[in-house]
């Protein structure tokens, strides 16, 4: 396990009620950071996560808000930054597959205009909204942004063609934001493969087994695996920006 001294650092993690987001918030808080955990308003898992981390002695707070809605995202980011006294790190982890089952690329009828708009608003425009609102705080702190993309953003194969397109766009925006916000702010991304979490979209077990058979490390990645990569890009990697780090156990090797 990699480690760092994050005492005095301030972080906002979106999509932090479960999975990679919660793993990241837990790791950062355990290393001394003050962490604002964001997820959808009314999601009971958000309050449960905050309560559990506080019981462990961590300095955390809930920052409910919908990154898929412009005003909600803006208010959430600014309120969180003011509440914790600034922002050193923004982790854009919130995202949605928008479907409970994978949609084959040929099933164009299932990929409606409304489906496109929802995924674009959450997965692609959502991170932009958060970066836009957080930029003044991050520049003042000479901070860092990490976006959660996906290996499907490189070669497809995700929950839908639409999802893959949004993650490909986020990989591209990671480069654009690195140029736009440097030298004060570094912007990177991770591209996860298989994740051990209760994700909204469930892939067939045969597909998961086939993926594991191809992957050199032969296991599904845990939220902690991805959190360590995010920690590296936030607290280390001082000469790395505009990069998307593939974290998939070798699945795409």
Residue positions per predicted region:
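Canonical Rossmann dinucleotide-binding motif of NAD(H)/NADP(H)-dependent dehydrogenases/reductases
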Residues: 4-36
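C-terminal substrate-recognition "lid" of short-chain dehydrogenase/reductases
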Residues: 84, 131, 137-139, 219-247, ...
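Catalytic Tyr-X3-Lys loop
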Residues: 96, 109-128, 146, 163, ...
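Substrate-binding pocket helix/loop in short-chain dehydrogenase/reductase
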Residues: 101-117, 200, 211
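Active-site helix of classical SDR
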Residues: 131, 166, 174
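Alpha-helical segment proximal to the catalytic Tyr-Lys
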Residues: 136, 178-183
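Residue(s) in the substrate-gating loop at a strand-loop-helix junction
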Residues: 150
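Short, small/polar-rich loop/turn modules that mediate ligand/substrate recognition or access, typified
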Residues: 182-186, 240-242
């Amino acid at each position: 396990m990699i480690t760092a001294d994050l005492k005095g650092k301030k972080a906002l993690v979106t999509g932090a009620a479960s999975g990679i987001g919660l793993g990241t918030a837990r790791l950062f808080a355990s290393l001394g950071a003050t962490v604002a955990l964001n997820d959808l308003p009314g999601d009971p898992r958000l309050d449960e996560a905050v309560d559990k981390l506080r019981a462990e002695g961590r300095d955390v707070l809930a920052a409910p808000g919908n990154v898929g809605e412009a005003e909600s995202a803006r208010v959430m980011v600014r309120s969180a930054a003011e509440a914790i006294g600034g922002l050193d790190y923004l982790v854009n982890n919130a995202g949605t597959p928008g479907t409970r089952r994978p949609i084959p690329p040929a099933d164009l009828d299932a990929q409606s205009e409304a489906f496109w708009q929802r995924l674009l608003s959450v997965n692609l425009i959502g991170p932009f909204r958060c970066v836009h609102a957080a930029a003044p705080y991050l520049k003042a702190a000479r901070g860092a942004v990490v976006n959660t993309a996906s290996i499907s953003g490189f070669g497809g194969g995700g929950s839908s063609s639409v999802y893959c397109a949004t993650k490909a766009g986020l990989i591209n925006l990671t480069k654009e934001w690195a140029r736009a916000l440097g030298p004060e702010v570094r912007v990177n991304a991770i591209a996860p493969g298989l994740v051990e979490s209760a994700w909204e979209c469930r892939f067939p077990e045969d597909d998961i087994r086939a993926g594991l058979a191809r992957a050199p490390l032969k296991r599904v990645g845990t939220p902690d695996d991805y959190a360590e990569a995010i920690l590296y890009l936030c607290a280390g990697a001082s000469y790395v920006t505009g990069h998307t780090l593939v974290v998939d156990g070798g699945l795409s090797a």
